[in-house]
């Protein structure tokens, strides 16, 4: 007898319908065709044991499974549930009437219980687009999938519940989530606040500019100057996620299996801080079965690279393309996929191997060659893509011991939001452009042209500091953001001067090291 169930395959951060055809006929054996991976082929034993433990007999006949479309790789153990249901339906243990109306996905344990899966959110979106009646999946993923409106989400614990529901023997209660209420609930909740930061007003100002325009930033300073502490507070001054950004961010983390159980929507911008031993594949994504990397997990948030020169040269260089295009393409022999990668890069580093070159109190023990070699680990093209390059000085005792609180993140965030609102209105007719950091050269000419005095100062800096054309564009973008923070329509000379001051590493000789 032929039975059909509906499953899904994740491709990038979207899901594709997979139809699973099962025939149970005379003979013996179990065969799965349709480009399954090893985990899918191994499902026979998991399904057999799960069925036996829940009171069903595995058919003593030939079971043939065909998964279509056949040109898409079927990966993982999440196909256990639709395979088991298809086999039971082919063996006339389940009515066929309701099979084609539900999406089924879930990994089976040997006792017949269901284990969580990856990619439940994009699968639920696909099910709604196909106008299916509902999505039956493990209970642990129900809240995640329930953010999709106009689709019934049935979280179940075991195979028996699914069989009884499809046979009309029991009713399941659909999981419901008020998406907008969930989205609003956790807005503005941050574990770290800039009020805790003593001194460092110039660095806090640079962070404000970076967040207001979506600019990348590099902090250079000795150990203990507060680089990492301030970077961790960055999400607290970034503009809140929009609902569409929250959904897209949650989809990426769903595909990667990074959502905590019971999570509905990610309402705070992600902050990813990979270790410097990370591989290029782990950073940008890929692998035998492509998965999002750290730069995609940081989408709509912050990617913090602490001790930047300690990362391998290959790791740093693979970031150049996604930093420019805000998307990462993974190509394989038979297919390619794309992951979004619109993140704000925040990096920190010491000025030299010992960390104390230029320190007001501690002596550097490095020679000029060591300093030059250390700084040369970061290529010029990568530095060009970092809009703000800030020197972080140690905090003196008077500032550190002061009991006066610093400016709270909430106050800084309000100024950032006001500047972003100006940019949203400015770029409302420009598809794919949301902030100043994303401006194209034509938009720079249109919106960031400085006044005559500013242009003269920029020309002088370009000649004196031997800047590249990309650095020229970055300065104009940052100057436009500074003007937005002031609420001025024109880019003036003092905006240009402040933007140039944020290009520390563009100086011909920085801290004794030629770059």
Which stretches of residues belong to each language-model region?
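Peripheral, non-AAA+ core regions of ATP-driven protein-machinery
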Residues: 1-218, 222-225, 471-472, 489-515
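Short beta-strand elements
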Residues: 18-24, 283, 387-390
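Basic, amphipathic alpha-helical bundle interface domains used for macromolecular binding and assembly
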Residues: 33, 39-44, 59, 66-76, ...
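Walker A/P-loop
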Residues: 219-260, 325
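Walker B catalytic acidic pair
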Residues: 300, 306-307, 318
